[in-house]
Structure formats: structure tokens, C-alpha cells
Amino acid sequence: MKFFIDTADVKEIREAHELGVVDGVTTNPSLIAKSGRKFADVIKEITSIVDGPISAEVVALDHDGMIKEAEELVKIHPNIVIKLPMTTEGLKATKTLHGEGIKTNVTLIFSPMQALLAAKAGASYVSPFVGRLDDISQDGMGIVEEIRTIFDNYGYTTEIIVASVRNPVHVLNSALIGADVATIPYSVIMQLAKHPLTDAGIKKFLEDWEKVPK
């Protein structure tokens, strides 16, 4: 299973990358806006840190606009993956970019059928948003499980990125279901590394070590 970090904060990306667990990065316009920096500058710096897929999202809503933005974005670095919205125009753009050999990540997926349409259009990745589904009392991880089953049934190679991850349980369930990727906020990555019994064990070892004759 791959871990992407879901942020545009370069400091967070550097710190998580130093742990040796980050395989890629996902960004979106909201995350870029929080950085207060130019979009292209942020993406360039991220590609210098992480040698893996970097999802960068278009903001155009029409096919031609999406393609124009995508073709500019991929000039930044070969690892750029174009994030496209799950709309009919987004599907058209996915098909076009697939034909050009450009990788795509169809985002804002909230149903198995949306994921299937994206896979059929040639998406490299689909991103179901589990946290947002949970927020409206739907079963976010259940949707991921259904997508996994459908893709396996028909041999789709489109990878599933579990997005809108809110807690370590989302990551655990993603791994158990067989999702290809979980894209995780920095704070949740840090939570994954912690356990109170680990802290207690370290404390006990150090206390015992102090008793050893020096």
C-alpha cells in the first residue's frame, strides 16, 4: 500500500518524507491557497522533495480549459498527475489526456459508479472522499470496498486513492480493503506512528537503564 501526503505545506512534506513513508503528494486549490504562494512555485518545490506522483488540480470546468491547464502543468515535472473533477467535462478531459499519455486523478468521487466511469475513461487514479461521505451519514469505506470489488471483477488497473482521510481508522480500513493508496494529512501520519504503550515502554526501558551500574 502506498501513502501519499495530502498537503501543499512544504515543511510538512519535508518532515513526512524524512520518515521514509511518503510515496507521493496530493494537492488541491484550497491547499495551495493556504500556502499563500504561487501555484507553480509550490508544485516545483514539492517535486524537488518527493520522487513520486504529485497530483495538481485544474480549476477550469470545461474540457478545453482543463486540457490547456493540464498541458502546462505537466511541463513542470514528469511526475505531475492531473487532478480532474468527476463531471462529464472531467471525463472527456480524462479520455483526452489518457490518449496523450498524461496521468490523471479523477477527484471528488462519491459513488462506485462515478469511479467506474472514471476508470472506463482511462483515469490513472480515482479519489473517493471517505470523510465527506461519513459527514453526511453515508459509509465512506463501504464505497471504497465496492469500488475495489468492481475494479477487481473487470481487471481495471486504475488505482484507488482513499481521500478525505480524517483519522488512523480510515487508513487501517483502507489497507484492509485493499485500496492502492491512502492520501493522508500530516497530522494523521503523525498519529499513525504513536501508541501509548510504545511511549510507556520507552519510559520503562530508560528507567531500568538508570539502575544499571555505570
UniProtKB/Swiss-Prot annotation:
Q: Which residues form the active site?
A: K83
Keyword Cytoplasm attributed: yes
Which UniProt keywords are present, listed alphabetically? Cytoplasm, Pentose shunt, Schiff base, Transferase
**Which coarse location class applies to the principal site listed for this UniProt protein?**
cytoplasm
Its localization reads: Cytoplasm
Task: Write out the GO cellular component annotations.
Answer: cytoplasm
Q: Which residues form a coiled coil?
A: none
Q: Which Pfam families match?
A: TAL_FSA
HAMAP family, sorted: Transaldolase_3b
Q: Which NCBIfam families match?
A: fsa_talC_mipB
Put simply, this protein is called Probable transaldolase
Q: Which organism is it from?
A: Geotalea uraniireducens (strain Rf4)
- Write the lineage as a comma-separated list: Bacteria, Pseudomonadati, Thermodesulfobacteriota, Desulfuromonadia, Geobacterales
